[in-house]
Amino acid sequence: MDKEDLKRQAAARALEEVRSGMKLGLGTGSTARHFVELLGEKVRGGLDVIGVPTSEVTRADAERCGIRLTTLDEIDRLDLTVDGADEVDTRLELIKGGGGALLREKIVAAASDRMIVIADESKWVDCLGKFPLPVEVIPFGLAATRRAIEKAFTQVGAAGQLKLRDGEAGHAFVTDGGHWIVDAHLGRIPDAPRLAKLLSEIPGVVEHGLFIGIASTVVLAGTEGIRTVERA
Ligand SMILES: O=C(CO)[C@H](O)[C@H](O)COP(=O)(O)O
């Protein structure tokens, strides 16, 4: 079974949690896209839901699939967000933002009663940090912001290279919010909750890819089957 099959299986399991009338956060990335496609099939079969997309790419996918969309300005809370992740640890702390949508993903997940993370089992780790940690930054004063980010890493005993994410034609990658992303190649993040707090205090940092205490459930699809882990 290839990875896309596993991602789709995880997405299908999460879909079992969706009921008519729900307001849903729609994640970004290849695994979340499977969920959007499967949800679209249900919607075409009569399921009545409304979604808030976490990126322009997901907005386009959802529209193509016939899913009704709204915004967080028009509705209050969401019942459920289903999204992928780049890494998940045993405390259900996440690294997200490989696809560059971390800011909207975090806003949407935080506005949801539940967040289900869907992933293939390769995303499950003992310690976060092998996947480069995305940090969304304001272009103004980038060098100063980078220094502050590096200081935060030192404070938690982490170290590694910070690389500005490349976009098209030699330009920096630009997020849906018009910001840049620096990816931190740390290898290991010893204290993710503390690092999350420190990064949030840096003025030039818009958001970071550490999702702490946000995911309620992780659905992991592997060759042995599907495993569901709930946050303690
Ligand atoms: O955080 C994300 C996008 O910003 C994605 O959820 C994350 O990168 C996982 O993507 P994929 O399902 O393609 O592995």
UniProtKB/Swiss-Prot annotation:
<dbReference type="InterPro" id="IPR037171">
    <property type="entry name" value="NagB/RpiA_transferase-like"/>
</dbReference>
<feature type="binding site">
    <location>
        <begin position="96"/>
        <end position="99"/>
    </location>
    <ligand>
        <name>substrate</name>
    </ligand>
</feature>
<dbReference type="InterPro" id="IPR004788">
    <property type="entry name" value="Ribose5P_isomerase_type_A"/>
</dbReference>
<dbReference type="Pfam" id="PF06026">
    <property type="entry name" value="Rib_5-P_isom_A"/>
</dbReference>
<dbReference type="GO" id="GO:0009052">
    <property type="term" value="P:pentose-phosphate shunt, non-oxidative branch"/>
</dbReference>
<feature type="binding site">
    <location>
        <begin position="83"/>
        <end position="86"/>
    </location>
    <ligand>
        <name>substrate</name>
    </ligand>
</feature>
<dbReference type="InterPro" id="IPR050262">
    <property type="entry name" value="Ribose-5P_isomerase"/>
</dbReference>
<dbReference type="GO" id="GO:0004751">
    <property type="term" value="F:ribose-5-phosphate isomerase activity"/>
</dbReference>
<comment type="subunit">
    <text>Homodimer.</text>
</comment>
<comment type="function">
    <text>Catalyzes the reversible conversion of ribose-5-phosphate to ribulose 5-phosphate.</text>
</comment>
<dbReference type="InterPro" id="IPR020672">
    <property type="entry name" value="Ribose5P_isomerase_typA_subgr"/>
</dbReference>
<feature type="binding site">
    <location>
        <begin position="28"/>
        <end position="31"/>
    </location>
    <ligand>
        <name>substrate</name>
    </ligand>
</feature>
<feature type="binding site">
    <location>
        <position position="123"/>
    </location>
    <ligand>
        <name>substrate</name>
    </ligand>
</feature>
<comment type="similarity">
    <text>Belongs to the ribose 5-phosphate isomerase family.</text>
</comment>
<protein>
    <recommendedName>
        <fullName>Ribose-5-phosphate isomerase A</fullName>
        <ecNumber>5.3.1.6</ecNumber>
    </recommendedName>
</protein>
<keyword id="KW-0413">Isomerase</keyword>
<feature type="active site" description="Proton acceptor">
    <location>
        <position position="105"/>
    </location>
</feature>
<comment type="pathway">
    <text>Carbohydrate degradation; pentose phosphate pathway; D-ribose 5-phosphate from D-ribulose 5-phosphate (non-oxidative stage): step 1/1.</text>
</comment>
